[in-house]
């Protein structure tokens, strides 16, 4: 059977027959025809949506642990022991649902002391 004959055979099928063909191909080859469609459809929706709230996560303390603890105390309002525990337990989320400006400010302060921060 040539490629053209195969295409002509598909053209002559009903929607139900095409559906059965797709299911048979999925089973035979262990693939899913829907996976590509889902990924393609999800991409533009995410691009159009801009986040307004961020979680600020301390991912790495760096060399200036004492200075990072001071900044963590400042931005979270925690006591010395609690702030030290957070820093020692990195990666940890320091602030949840922070505005973009607040998250950027916290990130800048921590990075100035040598810490690594991720906004999620």
Swiss-Prot record:
Entries under InterPro entries matching the protein: Ribosomal_bL12 (IPR000206), Ribosomal_bL12_C (IPR013823), Ribosomal_bL12_C/ClpS-like (IPR014719), Ribosomal_bL12_oligo (IPR008932), Ribosomal_bL12_oligo_N_sf (IPR036235)
The entry's cellular-component GO terms read: cytosolic large ribosomal subunit
Gene3D superfamilies for the chain: 3.30.1390.10, Single helix bin
Q: Which CDD domains match?
A: Ribosomal_L7_L12 (cd00387)
Q: Which GO terms describe its molecular function?
A: mRNA binding; structural constituent of ribosome
Q: According to its UniProt record, what is one Pfam family this protein matches?
A: Ribosomal_L12_N
Signal peptide segment: none
* Keywords for this protein: Ribonucleoprotein, Ribosomal protein
Show the SUPFAM superfamilies listed in the entry. Answer: ClpS-like, Ribosomal protein L7/12, oligomerisation (N-terminal) domain
Q: Single Gene Ontology BP term?
A: translation
Which family does the entry's similarity section mention?
Answer: Belongs to the bacterial ribosomal protein bL12 family.
Name the job this protein performs. Forms part of the ribosomal stalk which helps the ribosome interact with GTP-bound translation factors. Is thus essential for accurate translation.
Instruction: Give the matching PANTHER family.
Output: 39S RIBOSOMAL PROTEIN L12, LARGE RIBOSOMAL SUBUNIT PROTEIN BL12M
Tell me which HAMAP family the record gives: Ribosomal_bL12
The annotated subunit structure for this chain is: Homodimer. Part of the ribosomal stalk of the 50S ribosomal subunit. Forms a multimeric L10(L12)X complex, where L10 forms an elongated spine to which 2 to 4 L12 dimers bind in a sequential fashion. Binds GTP-bound translation factors.
Please report the name of this protein according to its UniProt entry. Large ribosomal subunit protein bL12
What species does this protein belong to? Lachnoclostridium phytofermentans (strain ATCC 700394 / DSM 18823 / ISDg) (Clostridium phytofermentans)
